[in-house]
């Protein structure tokens, strides 16, 4: 079989600081007013009073959505979305394009390695540049799947289970339980600057949800890098009577020794998890060595599907789970092939968590949502990632080459 070559790569953005606010899409933080995701949630910036109430107040939504499309010389296209916005467009159109155009559609690993090495001098340990590389990588997998007529999960070797079961992340685990999810993960609202009073308030929230959801429904806390080891340890032990399943991302990503100590001090049976803001394969190797229970890479931020597969192998070798952070179809096609991913995350993007809204709405067409907390593998049986780009969105292409 003669495979086509890549003829063009294009990059658009929606939302972010230089466009309309509240656009949603690949930057799921970019929501409108009165949304739970922008309510009083603990962050590393919460210690500053003027940035305590809203995450958008310190600029969590300034990047916006990056959309990368790759076109083969036979006219077929693949695309993907992530969080990088207008700056990601510059990186794609003015730097990464040289490693993409002219390559065979199957040269995904070669392109990936060249992008990583060519950006080492300004990529650091992840962030915007890695988000952009991830988006390109996902677009390449989408194109390859569409060219050969197979869903991405079959390109990875096929499913190891018939369906994916999900827990829901949002402010209302009780509503998630009614929808059939296996668990609910809530954001914490207080941090070390609030002292023991902050711990009492978050524990009261957990206790209230435990009473509403009963003894067996999973409850978890997402701390979003807002704590230190001492505070996180006290919070974990205070939540232990309420059967908290895990405590997540308590510390900034570089604090590996802190994660090691937190795992050592955590209550027996309570898992310690992290990873969504780690941005390189090497950082996940170091994170794995801390002994945490679950690694949680975001496939749109960690280097793409190519890196996610490698991270899963690191975790598997240590007997750890890998449960990616959100990412909808881009995670679905990966985790259904991983033997160490028994469940996955669904991020509730409806403002009040009362309805199921696709995570990347409105930028993806055909994006599936769980039914009774599950997605069957047959739902994924479309070429590539099985979704299409919504070109009715206000796509902006600020750079060309």
Swiss-Prot record:
The active site is at residue 325. Pfam families: MR_MLE_C, MR_MLE_N. Substrate binds at residues 29, 55, 345. Binds 1 Mg(2+) ion per subunit. Keywords: Lyase, Magnesium, Metal-binding. It is an enzyme of class 4 (lyase). One of its GO terms (molecular function) is L-rhamnonate dehydratase activity. NCBIfam families: PRK15440.1. This is L-rhamnonate dehydratase. It comes from Klebsiella pneumoniae subsp. pneumoniae (strain ATCC 700721 / MGH 78578).
